[in-house]
Amino acid sequence: MGLVGDMDMTDNMMIRSYRNGKGPFLDRKGPRALAEKIKDQLEVMTPSISAPVRQMSGGNVQKVLVGREIAQNPKVLLVAFPTRGVDINTSHVIYQLLNEQKKKGVAVVCVIEDLDVVLELLSLIHI
């Protein structure tokens, strides 16, 4: 599930929890705290978590997306070209996040075209 460009970080965090909501009122405290945590931990460059994500660079959008999905504590994480179009520093951050998930026992399924990254990041390769 992607991000909505006209929505801010908090609203994009809430996308994953709309179906769990009770009634027409949604709790924004948890998603706001998650947005702040992702912004700080992944060094997302944005003037505010209230700014629309379309105003962010591609690398920062990727950080928000990967951070949101990892925050769901998945058992399986499927990513396709997670660093396409991002700068080298952001790609290292994203690969580090995926590696941390692998160490936690999460099955990380990747579609990646860079063989060096594949050999460094993954423990099982299918071609």
Q: How should these model regions be labeled?
A:
Residues 1-125:
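Glycine-rich phosphate-binding loops of nucleotide-dependent enzymes
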